[in-house]
Amino acid sequence: MLQMPSKQPISAGIVIVAAGRGERAGSSKEGPKQYRMIGGKPVIVHTLENFMTWEPATEIVVVIHPDDEALFARALRHIISATPIETVHGGPTRQQSVLAGLRHLKDKRISHVLIHDAVRPFFDHVLLDRIAESLDNGAQAVLPAIPVTDTLKRADSAGTVLTTVSREHLYAAQTPQSFAFETILDAHEKAAASGRSDFTDDASIAEWAGIPVTIVAGTPDNVKLTVKKDIAMADDKLSASLLPDVRTGNGYDVHQLEAGDGVTLCGVFIPHDQKLKGHSDADVALHALTDALLATCGAGDIGDHFPPSDPQWKGAASRIFIEHAARIVREHGGTIMNADVSLIAEAPKVGPHRESMRMRLSEYLGIDIERCSVKATTNETIGFVGRREGIAAIATATVVYRGVKR
């Protein structure tokens, strides 16, 4: 018997629109609202993580403002994923930003595209699967929406009510708005070529182009964070359901000194008449801190991950070790809150280099410099340290892990 060929699952590209300035949310040192912190992470990170863990998503492009390169790079430090995330600069309007994202995906092997506002972090896979099912069944354009429940009034310019508008067949549109890729790209290109740049969502462009738009049920939680109060409420929502899980790890290391031209401590080279002896660069401070970080999630110690018997680590920069440990912490759901290093040495003097060391720790760990501490003391000429035969380091790391549900 002749069998019909089975349908191929959709291969979805994701366009996340994050180029807006968000004036209604007020100014903040954290930047535009998509970079504000909720539940310990930037808004855009929550949005990205939802898509990165959704199987049909094969390509993700984030449309950002040209001024936000550093903000976006900092946000990405919260994410560990094999899913590639690419960026493209947006335009003056949302419509132009979306077109930039679509053009970036043009040469990718995708069948469909989901276009989503970065500041809608509370969608879920149930909604995404509902959209995918509609696309898989042949819909060219899919709009998640919820029926309007408020009573609607039409008023004149003076604020006088003219009439009550029937709510029947009225819906509030949400994102991700989803389409057959070539169909929406063509519609966007035609809208741009015609001089239209005033569309406020992508379903409107589909309607203008004569493409049927299918509604699927949205979710009440899938709200757009628009004003400052929205962001505060989102933070409360994410934080209230979690119990804090604060962990502290300790690390200790020591390396011998021998004749040389300097030592590397916390990634900073200090000229000296001795050097530290070791398989790698022998940065005793970073080695101790690596162990402290690994201890917070029970991930062994530095020797487990970088055996001194392995020739590939001979002479290696210890930055590799500390960044690896920080990555493991984040993979386990941890946020590094504080890193403290105490160096015990008779020489060289650490004080003149302390700020440079703190800056390096901040860079390696992806945390603010105020969360990085470096201290030093001598051993009062006692023992091997006192005899200038070695340098020791003690490190403490404080990490908050994603809590458990109450």
From Swiss-Prot:
PROSITE patterns: ISPD, ISPF. PANTHER family: 2-C-METHYL-D-ERYTHRITOL 2,4-CYCLODIPHOSPHATE SYNTHASE, CHLOROPLASTIC. One of its GO terms (biological process) is terpenoid biosynthetic process. This is Bifunctional enzyme IspD/IspF. Its cofactor is a divalent metal cation. 4-CDP-2-C-methyl-D-erythritol 2-phosphate binds at D253, V254, H255, H279, S280, D301, I302, G303, T377, T378, N379, E380, F384, R387. The record marks R167, K224 as: Positions MEP for the nucleophilic attack. The record marks R24, K33, H279, T378 as: Transition state stabilizer. It catalyses: 2-C-methyl-D-erythritol 4-phosphate + CTP + H(+) = 4-CDP-2-C-methyl-D-erythritol + diphosphate; 4-CDP-2-C-methyl-D-erythritol 2-phosphate = 2-C-methyl-D-erythritol 2,4-cyclic diphosphate + CMP. A divalent metal cation binds at D253, H255, H287. It comes from the Bacteria. In the N-terminal section; belongs to the IspD/TarI cytidylyltransferase family. IspD subfamily. Bifunctional enzyme that catalyzes the formation of 4-diphosphocytidyl-2-C-methyl-D-erythritol from CTP and 2-C-methyl-D-erythritol 4-phosphate (MEP) (IspD), and catalyzes the conversion of 4-diphosphocytidyl-2-C-methyl-D-erythritol 2-phosphate (CDP-ME2P) to 2-C-methyl-D-erythritol 2,4-cyclodiphosphate (ME-CPP) with a corresponding release of cytidine 5-monophosphate (CMP) (IspF). Residues 247-406 are annotated as: 2-C-methyl-D-erythritol 2,4-cyclodiphosphate synthase. InterPro entries: IspD (IPR001228), IspD/F (IPR026596), IspD/TarI (IPR034683), ISPD_synthase_CS (IPR018294), MECDP_synthase (IPR003526), MECDP_synthase_CS (IPR020555), MECDP_synthase_sf (IPR036571), Nucleotide-diphossugar_trans (IPR029044). GO terms for molecular function: 2-C-methyl-D-erythritol 2,4-cyclodiphosphate synthase activity; 2-C-methyl-D-erythritol 4-phosphate cytidylyltransferase activity; metal ion binding. CDD domains: CDP-ME_synthetase, MECDP_synthase. Residues 1-246 are annotated as: 2-C-methyl-D-erythritol 4-phosphate cytidylyltransferase. The gene is ispDF.
